[in-house]
């Protein structure tokens, strides 16, 4: 069962498990949105389809808190908060190296063919600006526990920007060439 963090008539906040897709994909694996629709349908004896608005996403390997809208009005308001940066998005991550903290700004381009993103020059066609701040919480064994605040929400942004700064996330199979198979990415929303 998916842990429920908060629930009312308008919102549903849950703890997304790591390695679960937020919505259905070609893998056919169970996805969070479908499971939560089933939860609402069963709990409230809802006939037919259940509305549940997806207003933000987390990468498949990342776990953490997610908010869903139970009404279209709530979906519009939440989407507005996310797009206007009214929603505060904070993450905990374990980065390789002794990350000093600070602000990272740059441009990210998503490669649709590979599903990866990369830091690129500002004038690159299709590139989007990306900004985050991060602060060290603790240092241990050549790694840093950091708190990351997103100011933009780009594809794989934290993973790409910290790796680009020389502090890839522990266990990140895509952007940390030293990650070992089977390691779980150390990133939590």
Regions found by a protein language model. Give the residues of each.
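RNA pseudouridine synthases
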Residues: 1-189
